[in-house]
Amino acid sequence: MHMLEKITKENDIKQIERQDYPALAAEIRDFLIEKVSIHGGHLASNLGTVELTMALHAVMNFPKDKLIFDVGHQSYTHKILTGRKDAFETLRQYDGLSGFPKRNESPCDAFDTGHSSTGISAAMGYSIARDLCGGDEKVAVVIGDGSLTGGMAYEALNGLAQLKTGCVVVINDNNMSIGKNVGGLSKYLNEIRLGNAYNELKTGVESSLMGSKTGKKIAKVLKRSKDNIKQFFVPGMFFEELGITYVGPIDGHDINQMITTFQHAFRLDKPIIIHVKTKKGKGYGYAERHPDYFHGIAPFDRISGKVLAAKKTSCYTDIFAKKMVKLGETHEDVVAITAAMAQGTGLVRFEEAYPKRFFDVGIAEQHAVAFAAGMAAAGMVPVVAIYSSFLQRSYDQILHDVCLQKLHVILAIDRAGLVGQDGETHQGIYDLAYLSHMPHMIVLAPKNRYELEAMLDYAYAYDGPIAIRYPRGSAYKGHADIQTPIVYGKSEVIQEASGVAVFSCGHMMEEADRLVERLEAKQIPVTLVNVRFQSMLDTELLDRLMKTHTVFVTLEDTIMQGGYGEKLHAYLAEKNSPEQYTFISGAIPLPSVPQGTIPELRHHMQIDAEGLAEKIVPCYKKHLK
């Protein structure tokens, strides 16, 4: 690690000789493979952007200049080059180094990211603010070709073209072919279009021609001729038509070429797109051959490439995927929709079985939901599978296009609740709060693997908008012997006693079982309720339990505001005087939740069995007096 030892703070890369950059890139790759193999994280995308990030750092000056990473999972090299190499020992751990850009982690991180297609808008904001304040800082954004399937990216490009602010947009193309390089002529045209002489001449000629009626006609003919030539030779014609200079494709592993290109681009005070071709997973054979598998990966053995994990058990995503195939077989009106998450949501199985009834719309959650609404209006039964963290992007479509029309759209919300080490931007803790107040929407959550299947059957039969929330990770097998029919608005009583009533929402049942065990060990009688319908109360059950219970506890995987417990507490307050009962919330008390393992996070917030038991015991004893 000879070269890497010289990088202790931002801008240190400028002290390294250009001829040594390839050696530094190799050391960075080796370092990334080592650290991600230990801690897990996003590997393939970071291996592919080493030279690209180095080239930007060689040209930019941090923290004055602003570099934004769309999505942000490809920012590891940026973190290394800004003095955070040693912090990789805590990558994605509680109170450790984030796997995404974080402004509170370093002044060199210009903008927090985690979701797709937002980067160009943020960079445009920085550029306009600079112009208004008379600054001279460079602004650049790195966005992947996958993120260009999100409509927001094009909204931002349109804005850039209109405002003409100086901003460099680097398209990191590691998969989807945007355009084909036609060799020397393409390179020659790129060099010309980046040159000052060309741009000054172009501006002068256009101004002169537009000064007269004849000149305008000549300009129109010239533009038509230019467009015909460029349409044949220049792969970025689409961007040129928007009014943004396009350069590329260029080799994303040729540091010298990228440095030269970036230097020229930053000198021009206008929006420029630089299309860079990279190889995802570069430098690690397993990641090159299986880039999707090594996109986000758990700790693994770097020699064999195999994940170091406990014996695999079925997860909720697997259960969902298998059940979807069965639903598709039984019901020909079932269609499946996802937003660039066919693998992650398990819908690849449905795609293989029923390719004509499967639709991956790309990173376009808004479109996915409105598309589903149209299908539902036409008599189909669409199942939209999206991660909780990304579903919030389609809020308006769920409300306006689905709920107000009471359309039969099934939302399969994967990664609901705490997801752990990806941090604030990926926790699935907000969906219930915004879904439960929508007209006609009902939200369910299964207590175990078996109930997820039953809820999907219920969702198919239900005539209206319905959402099912389930987490990442192993599917709970507990209470397999208790499978009562699902009835609208009704909770399920697992065991009934008196004194303490515990209401468990969805997969929190496993934690609830641990809580019940702790309380019963202290001779405290417990009623355990499987909530099932998180968006509504079973008031008939509550009225009965209020006669024999004094302590009411919820275990929830969502934020407190707008959660199930908030509704429960309000109902208790309406029906009782304060001295008659105690309510203890096991919902998430924080507005945002940092990275960490799920047990760590629950313990920190005191919403695990241990923390809740400590609150319950004294309250129960108080009511005995």
Report each predicted region and the residues it spans.
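Non-catalytic terminal/interface segments that mediate subunit docking, oligomerization
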Residues: 66, 278-280, 284-391, 397-406, ...
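Long, well-ordered, tryptophan-enriched scaffold segments
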Residues: 4, 175-320
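Structural signature of the thiamine diphosphate
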Residues: 218-286, 408-413, 432-481, 609-625
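A glycine-rich helix N-cap at a beta->alpha junction
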Residues: 87-97, 162-176, 197, 403-415
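N-terminal amphipathic, basic-rich helices that act as targeting or association modules
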Residues: 1-81, 240, 244-246, 251-255, ...
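Cofactor-binding active-site loop characterized by glycine-rich and histidine/acidic residues
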Residues: 42-163, 333-334, 338-339, 347-348
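Glycine-/acidic-rich phosphate or pyrophosphate-binding loops and their flanking alpha/beta elements
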Residues: 260-263, 295-296, 315-330, 346-352, ...
